Amino acid sequence: MTERARAKLLDLKARQEAGVHMMCPRCGMDTMKEPIHTNALSRSADVYVCDACGTAEAMLAFMKQDYPLHLWAAFQPVRPPADFKEHSARAVMDTVLRTQSDELRRLYQLCRDDPGNAEWYRLEAFESCPGLIELWPQPFQAKYQAADGAVLIRFRNGPDGGIQMAADVTDK
């Protein structure tokens, strides 16, 4: 779990302890009962979830399965707005390379060095890179949709140990 995810979890716990009415952190539905302690306590995290999610977690626990926290509604990214679908792929590529290449490089390094948290870094990418529609941590590739195609940004380790970046435009 990343620092961003830990901060969200701590904020969620604090809001629940304060008695703030909220959506179920697991499914995102407005099914939480008042007072908060009458809901199910999650087996995955020390927070309350709705009764349906509590039942689902109990069934998964019986089957010795888990529903990862990065799939919970509370941890899904809030995507910043972008109007890339109205511009040409070349213009989108220029904008992304100028404004987001450092952030994408940082995320690549995090995914490379800490592959166990790659899904958390992927969620972080959607919040910090406006217009990003897909991100694959391995091999690292970011995709942006444009009016006339898509822009793909890829990173890899070069033979000299440095990081190499490639940017391509694919037509519709």
Question: Residue ranges of each PLM-predicted region?
Answer:
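Short, intrinsically disordered terminal segments enriched in charged and Pro/Gly residues
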Residues: 1-19, 61-101, 160, 164-170
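Residues immediately within or flanking Cys/His clusters that coordinate Zn2+
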Residues: 21-22, 47
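Short, cysteine/histidine-rich loop/knuckle motifs that typically chelate Zn2+
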Residues: 25-28, 52
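Short, non-ligating residues that shape and space the ligands of small metal-coordination modules
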Residues: 33-34, 56-60
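Short linker/helix segments within small regulatory modules
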Residues: 36-47
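Conserved short hydrophobic patches within well-ordered secondary structure
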Residues: 47, 55-56
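Surface-exposed polar/charged interaction patches
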Residues: 65-69, 78-81, 94-102, 107-118, ...
